Amino acid sequence: MARDTLTIPERVGDAQEISYASPAGPNVGALARDRIPVRAMKADDLRALVAIDRRIVGRDRSGYFQRKLAEALQESDVRVSLVAELDGHCIGFIMARVDLGEFGRVEPTAIIDTIGVDPDYRSFGVGRALLSQLIVNLRTLRVERVRTEVDWRDHDLMAYLERFDFAPSQQVCLDLDLVAAR
Amino acid sequence: MTAHATADTGLRGLDAGDLERVIEIDRTPGGRTRRRFFEKRFAAAAAHPEEFVHVGVMRGGALRGFAFARLLRGEFGREHVTAVLDAIGVEPVSRETGIGRTLLHELIARLRAVGARTLHSQTEWSDPELTHFFAAAGFKLAPRVALERSLATPLVEQIEED
């Protein structure tokens, strides 16, 4: 998972496409996700996502986000990516995937690709609202676990995710340097 | 995707006609398949061939193994092209015959040809066979950690700021 920006599902076909990215019901109390409205990500959120990312990384990654958004919305069996809004403006997003497995059941593991929060709203609980709502939605789908990758030097992000009960998985991340390994 | 090779044995790209065979090769000993995953991968590769690199090994007129990688441009805050190994598989009866090494060698050559500079992968810590395979191919531990959260328990929440 990139610190600045964090995606989930792929698609069987339009007729089978399901969106479970709607917010939870009103019986969850005054939590972060209630103070920060969170909704399902849409195709026309692209410009807002790119703008937030540009403010974080200092450059335009429109092409990259266009692909990630298409992946989240068109290649996903279940749409679970979310956007946080305040006063009608997108102030954060989380891109995640969860696939359908055999017999139409969801795969047991969801993947978080990217999370991003507008730097002007970093103390508003936006990340918590997004992660909190995603976890509620994934539990509703009966997904068993959620996984992401984090740069091991990003201690702040790892500490942040630990607060949401994330812990090291049994997956080992590997790289092959294609330039050096000739 | 590339067209089927005409030779009875050798290396070639994958195409839609390989879908069922790839699903079968990937089937677990318990019989579980990743049909949806491969259907989507083949569909995406057909729609956006520039984003995928794939190779299959033919022997005796049949596909015996395959490898599938996706190209990422602009991810991880980098400008250079990175590849992610989506899937690699060899049919059980053809394992330990060098097909895996041949697949990876060819995949790497094809990735270099399109300018990829790094190949990312993941493996289960408890899978010594695959871990050894990757280590022998030159993979190193990545500067990334896979974090996971069980969804068996709900998030304990309270009102607080980030």
Predicted stretch roles:
Chain B
Residues 13-17, 24-80, 86, 91, ...:
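Acetyl-CoA-dependent GNAT
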Residues 111-123:
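Conserved GNAT acetyl-CoA-binding A-motif
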Residues 137-156:
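Active-site/acyl-donor-binding loops of N-acyltransferases
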Residues 95, 121-130, 148:
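Conserved beta-strand-loop-alpha-helix junction that forms the acyl-donor binding cleft
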Residues 72-74, 93, 126-128, 152-154:
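Short coil/turn motifs at secondary-structure junctions
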Residues 101, 113, 125-143:
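Conserved active-site alpha-helix within GNAT-family acetyltransferase domains
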